[in-house]
């Protein structure tokens, strides 16, 4: 057999055994096949000292390019980072998701899935006041209609709990979000509820948030250092977070430029607490503090 490519000397990951080892890979028409070490006629790629990975999935970015002040073009960001699929984390809501789908998702070579924002206008970042998360503005019927229209594209809901978005509403926005997520699941659609938890107001403490989340829901910006954090007075990950993980709550790093801290990461890493690595790439931090997903993996 003549192979299209042979990748030699690369480090591959055996996810079944959780092991790393050096291996040659043989490719024909874009697929890995059994190899013959004596074969020739292929283009040889020397991957000595490098990891050879499948396409990565990044769980948090903002791709409404030209539609809000966070948006970046996925095809500029993702290929150089080895990302083939990515989640847009609530850039748009029911007011503007159609535009994002037509002008962003359909045109992208990178496969983009989305969490639709519970607030109709989507994320409003970079201002003193963000999107106002008034639970009265969360329309379950409208949101469900979008899940029915775009079941292949919309995979969950996004809510941003922060001083600038939910202060004064307490946990009511999250309570409403949980009700909507449960209704969508009851209708037969997979639905992750992803909750941004950074710079939390006093009326929405971490303990209250965790009590409301269901197994499979996601707590985002785990290592942030604005206001209440995940640590107790001894710098240990708090018991309520460890208990929440045991009952199936997912914890996402969400290493945004202002929503993470190296000291927090270092202390939490001792317990290998996070389950999802993500880098919330957006136009305002593409060339700044954030680093690619592969750096987070290392």
Model-derived features: positions:
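Metal-associated gating/positioning segment near the N- to mid-region
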Residues: 47-107
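Short catalytic-loop micro-motif centered on adjacent basic/acidic residues
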Residues: 85-89, 193-197, 251-255
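Conserved beta-strand positions in the central sheet of alpha/beta enzyme cores
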Residues: 87, 158, 220, 252, ...
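Histidine/acidic-residue-rich, glycine-tolerant segments that coordinate divalent metal ions
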Residues: 90-93, 105-240
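Glycine-enriched alpha-helix->loop->beta-strand junction motifs that scaffold or abut catalytic
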Residues: 153-154, 213-218, 243-250, 270-276
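His/Asp/Glu-enriched, well-ordered alpha-helical/loop segment
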Residues: 264-298
């Amino acid at each position: 057999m003549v192979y299209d490519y042979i990748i030699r000397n690369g480090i591959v990951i055996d996810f079944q055994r959780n092991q790393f080892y050096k291996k040659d890979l043989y490719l024909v028409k874009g697929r890995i096949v059994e190899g013959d070490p004596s074969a020739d006629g292929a283009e040889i790629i020397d991957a000595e000292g490098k990891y050879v990975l499948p396409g990565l999935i990044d769980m948090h970015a903002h791709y409404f390019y030209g539609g809000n002040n966070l948006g970046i073009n996925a095809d500029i960001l993702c290929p150089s980072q080895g990302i083939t699929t990515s989640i847009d984390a609530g850039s748009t809501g029911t007011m503007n998701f159609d535009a994002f789908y037509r002008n962003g998702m359909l045109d992208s070579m990178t496969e983009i899935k989305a969490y639709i924002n519970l607030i109709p206008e989507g994320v409003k970042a970079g201002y003193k006041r963000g999107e106002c998360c008034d639970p009265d503005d969360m329309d379950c019927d409208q949101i469900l209609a979008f899940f029915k229209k775009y079941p292949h594209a919309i995979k969950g809901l996004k809510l941003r709990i922060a001083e600038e978005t939910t202060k004064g509403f307490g946990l009511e926005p999250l309570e409403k979000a949980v009700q909507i997520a449960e209704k969508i699941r009851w209708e037969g659609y997979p639905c992750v509820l992803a909750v941004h938890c950074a710079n939390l107001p006093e009326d929405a403490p971490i303990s209250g948030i965790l009590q409301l989340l269901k197994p499979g829901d996601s707590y985002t910006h785990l290592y942030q250092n604005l206001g209440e954090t995940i640590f107790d007075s001894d710098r240990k990950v708090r018991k309520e977070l460890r208990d929440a993980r045991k009952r199936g709550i997912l914890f996402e790093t969400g290493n945004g430029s202002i929503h993470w801290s190296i000291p927090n990461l270092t202390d939490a890493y001792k317990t290998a607490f996070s389950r999802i690595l993500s880098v919330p790439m957006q136009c305002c931090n593409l060339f700044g503090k954030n680093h690619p997903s592969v750096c987070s993996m290392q």
